[in-house]
Structure formats: structure tokens, C-alpha cells
């Protein structure tokens, strides 16, 4: 059996990790709507530390959006999209939904961010030229089969839309090569098994819910209120399919097969944010939690994955002393009688910057 190492605030398991050979390294990001603000915080810390040793990237829904910002090296991008765009009535509008429109307007979101906050897609080219791969998960509308798409500059935004098209909330699926697709979370909310199928030996998984948490999606509870009874049965079938898939994924993460190693980064408790309709203070708090978890990962596990420790250490500024002034008072210039006792660490050969983490 493989190894699962939980990484969250208050859990000391990462501190016991010893050096190892990661092999092919994959980064997998779970969806979760606005709860993806936690993932944004983790990845912003990774980018701040210039930490990107990964060979493979896999994301679903909000996870695909966060990874897009990461591979394009745009720190703060995902946070701004979530806090500035997904909190507006142009995007999330229950009244519009009650009148027959979309509850979430992905068309508006994609068009608005492309115009006002575009992805720097060309910045990802150097990664892809090195052989690194990025896949977004979306599910077919007819049989819910999960498919994985590698974006190009021409297909990137449409793939993001497809991966995030929550059934019922975005009433129409997204067309890809003549086939209708919906949210990848239906069948593969955390594409860890696909990463293994693509040869990954070590997985870093960023979750948007506490580990080992099983839940009925909040959005389905809303749908029960808003949809007619005749429309509920197909949706109920979809939710049952999603829950079965989610349990299988959770079991895979808890008990990795073979020699697989999984580092699971997750919030220490349920986030304040919801998938939709979150308030800005909640999003801000969850973003900060993500940054703290990202820092903890870098200080414990991250340094095992790269040759150079990823954390930057900011040394205090050295002030150049001014000219020496000799006091005319005789006592002020007397030699010190007692010897100076240096700090213990001054003669400790084992003491270095690593002790400052």
C-alpha cells in the first residue's frame, strides 16, 4: 500500500517526512466553486516562492481555473476572479434563474475576465515546451463520462467553461467538438486516478473541504426548492452518481495503491465560503487560510521536492554605521573588564538558516 501524508494547520505528520525520490510529480486541484479561494491562497504562496517542480497538472472546475493561473504564473489572478467577478449579480443571480435563465452566467464570466483580466496564456508555453502537461476535466452530458482536455490558446476559455458548467445552474452544456459537456465534478471532482493513469508517482492534492469529509452538495439542496418535481428525478440520479464517484475518490486518497505517495493539502476545518453566494469577509478569511497551508507545505514537504529550499528568507537590512564619536567623558571610554559571552548558536556548526523556518 502507498502513503498518504495529510498537510494542514495543526497536523504534525509532514514534520516527520524524510527525503525521498518523488519520480513523476503531479499537482491535482479539486473543484468547489468559490471554495476554490482556499486553493488560490495555496498556489499564490507557491508562486511567491517560485515553487513549481510539477510534471503534470490536473484540475476540475474551480481547480482548473486555479491551475490556469498557476501555469500562467499569475499570482493573485484566481483571487481577483473569485472576489471581484463571481460575487456580482451579473454572475450569480437566483432571480434570473427563477425566470428561466442561468443561475450562474459562465458566458458573462468568461467574456468579462477575458476583457478585463485576461490569462497570460503565452506564459505557460515554456512549461509545455519542457514536456509538462495540463489537463482540465469535463463530463459528457449524455453518460457523465469524464474526459480530460489539454488547453491551447484557442480552446482554453471554452474548456474552463465546460469544466465549470454545473448541471441545472448553467442550463446549457458546453459544446466541444460537437459533444455537450458539463462540470467535471460530476464524475471526477479530484482527478487523482487519472494522474496515476498518466504515470504519476507522487501526487500533491489540494482539497477545498476537510479531508475525509463526505457531503451532499449544497447546490442540490437549493435545486430541490427551485425545480419542479418532474425535473428532480434526473438531477437526483446525477447526484447519486456524483456521490458514488466522490466516495471512490476519497477511498483512493485514503488508501493509495502500490508505492503511490499522496500529499493532501486541505483546510483544517470547513471553510467559511460556500460554493456560491459567499460574502467577501468569508472569502478573504479562507484565502488567508490557504496561504498559511501553502506556507506550511513549503516549509515541510516542498523542500523535499526541490534542490533549493523554496521559502525565501528575508534578512534584516544592514545599516552602515556613521563616523565613530569619542566621548570626552573618561569613564565612557574605559575598556570592558568582563569577557563577552557569545550566544550558543554562534559556535554551533549545525545552526543555519533552516532553523529560522
Regions found by a protein language model. Name each.
Residues 59, 63:
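Gly/Ala-rich beta-loop-alpha elbow adjacent to hydrolase catalytic centers
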Residues 1-58, 68-357:
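Patatin-like phospholipase
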Amino acid at each position: 500500500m502507498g502513503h498518504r501524508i495529510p498537510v494542514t494547520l495543526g497536523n504534525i505528520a509532514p514534520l516527520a517526512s524524510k527525503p525521498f525520490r518523488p519520480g513523476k510529480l503531479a499537482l491535482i486541484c479539486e473543484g468547489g466553486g468559490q471554495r476554490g479561494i482556499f486553493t488560490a491562497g495555496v498556489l499564490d504562496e507557491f508562486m511567491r516562492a517560485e515553487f513549481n517542480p510539477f510534471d503534470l497538472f490536473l484540475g476540475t472546475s474551480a481547480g482548473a481555473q486555479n491551475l490556469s493561473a498557476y501555469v500562467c504564473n499569475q499570482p493573485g489572478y484566481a483571487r481577483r476572479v473569485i472576489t471581484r467577478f463571481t460575487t456580482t449579480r451579473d454572475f450569480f443571480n437566483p432571480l434570473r434563474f427563477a425566470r428561466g435563465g442561468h443561475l450562474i452566467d459562465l458566458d458573462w464570466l468568461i467574456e468579462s475576465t477575458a476583457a478585463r483580466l485576461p490569462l497570460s496564456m503565452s506564459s505557460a508555453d515554456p512549461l509545455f515546451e519542457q514536456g509538462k502537461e495540463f489537463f482540465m476535466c469535463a463530463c459528457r452530458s449524455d453518460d457523465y463520462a469524464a474526459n480530460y482536455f489539454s488547453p491551447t490558446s484557442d480552446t482554453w476559455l471554452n474548456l474552463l467553461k465546460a469544466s465549470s458548467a454545473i448541471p441545472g445552474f448553467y442550463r446549457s452544456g458546453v459544446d466541444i467538438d460537437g459533444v455537450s459537456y458539463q462540470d467535471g465534478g460530476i464524475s471526477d471532482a479530484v482527478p487523482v486516478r487519472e494522474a496515476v493513469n498518466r504515470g504519476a508517482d507522487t501526487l500533491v492534492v489540494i482539497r477545498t473541504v476537510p479531508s475525509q469529509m463526505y457531503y451532499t452538495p449544497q447546490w442540490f439542496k437549493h435545486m430541490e426548492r427551485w425545480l419542479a418535481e418532474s425535473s428532480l428525478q434526473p438531477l437526483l440520479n446525477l447526484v447519486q452518481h456524483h456521490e458514488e464517484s466522490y466516495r471512490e475518490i476519497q477511498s483512493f486518497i485514503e488508501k493509495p495503491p502500490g508505492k503511490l505517495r499522496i500529499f493532501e493539502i486541505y483546510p483544517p476545518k470547513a471553510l467559511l465560503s460556500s460554493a456560491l453566494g459567499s460574502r467577501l469577509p468569508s472569502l478573504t478569511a479562507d484565502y488567508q487560510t490557504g496561504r498559511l497551508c501553502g506556507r506550511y507545505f513549503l516549509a515541510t514537504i516542498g523542500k523535499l521536492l526541490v534542490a533549493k529550499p523554496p521559502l525565501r528568507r528575508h534578512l534584516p537590512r544592514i545599516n552602515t554605521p556613521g563616523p565613530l564619536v569619542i566621548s570626552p567623558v573618561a569613564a565612557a571610554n574605559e575598556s570592558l573588564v568582563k569577557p563577552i559571552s557569545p550566544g550558543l548558536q554562534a559556535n554551533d556548526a549545525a545552526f543555519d538558516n533552516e532553523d529560522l523556518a
